[in-house]
Structure formats: C-alpha cells, structure tokens
Amino acid sequence: MTRRRERGQQPVGTRRAAREFAFRVLFEAERGKLPLETVFTRAEGDMREGDDTFAQLNAEALAFARQLVDGLGERRADVDAALRRTIRGWDFEQMAQTDLNVLRLATYEMLYTPEPHPPVIESAVRIARKFGGEDSGRFVNGVLGGLSRSLKTAPRLPQNTGAEDGPQE
C-alpha cells in the first residue's frame, strides 16, 4: 500500500534528498532491469502524486537528481572502472546491490561535478546506512575515502565531455 503525504507539506530542496531520489531510481532500474529514464519518469510522477516513498523535491533538487541519474547513465563504464581501481579484491557481483549503487552515484559525483567530496561521502554513508546492511556505512565510507584521496593526486575530469572523449589536459 502506498502512503500519501499530508497536504501542504513543502517540497524539500536538499542535495541529500536528491541523492536519495537518484539512488532509489538507480536501485529500481537495476533490480527491474529497466531503463533509467523510464524509472526516473515514473518516480517523478509518483512523487508529484504524493507517494511518500519519494521525498517531495523542489525543482532545483529534482534537476540535481536528474543530473546524477543521467550523468551516471552516460558515464557508468568510467565510474565502474574508477571503483574497480579503488576496490581491490572485490567483484561487483560479491557486493550488495545497495552498496554498489550508492558507490556508483557518489563516485560519479566525485569525478564529474564540482561538489566537494566530504558532503558527497557523508550523504552516501547516510544512504548506505538507511538502505543497506549493518556494515554498509563503513564499507561505503572506506571506499569513497580511498577514492577521494586518490583523486586529490589526479586531475579532475571535466563534466561536459562526450562519452567518447577522454579526460582533457
């Protein structure tokens, strides 16, 4: 049964809520083997109709969630490659889907947006704790902390390049 939000509840505009919305879209798309666009559109419609499974996002937060979902869709191979370099000794198939999806979203954001790493990591850890297993928060924090340290020594990747373009110098 779908719960409905109370009338008059104001939309939220936090990046954390947008990240959680994007995570839920990614998780549902992966689980149902559905296109990201299809799931995003359905989730947006459910949100607008008052389904409280999804936070009521304001326009800015919804645009940020869209940027994360679309960006990850376009850059997933690069994001997965960065994660594989960071997570040694783990196969993606060994990881909980929740942890992997949280890591993918945060890694995309750390690689391709100007957002500072600490709030990205903090939000990812909170989402992992909320939706994942007992050790998800620690695991996500460790992986993203390692990624952040490695990125401080590497040049930042540009956000708006085509999928076929490599990092620009």
UniProtKB/Swiss-Prot annotation:
GO terms for cellular component: cytosol. SUPFAM superfamilies: NusB-like. It holds the Pfam family NusB. Gene3D superfamilies: NusB-like (1.10.940.10). CDD domains: Terminator_NusB. One of its GO terms (molecular function) is RNA binding. GO terms for biological process: DNA-templated transcription termination; transcription antitermination. Keywords: RNA-binding, Transcription, Transcription antitermination, Transcription regulation. InterPro entries: NusB-like_sf (IPR035926), NusB_fam (IPR011605), NusB_RsmB_TIM44 (IPR006027). It comes from the Bacteria. Involved in transcription antitermination. Required for transcription of ribosomal RNA (rRNA) genes. Binds specifically to the boxA antiterminator sequence of the ribosomal RNA (rrn) operons. Belongs to the NusB family. This is Transcription antitermination protein NusB. It comes from Deinococcus geothermalis (strain DSM 11300 / CIP 105573 / AG-3a). The gene is nusB.
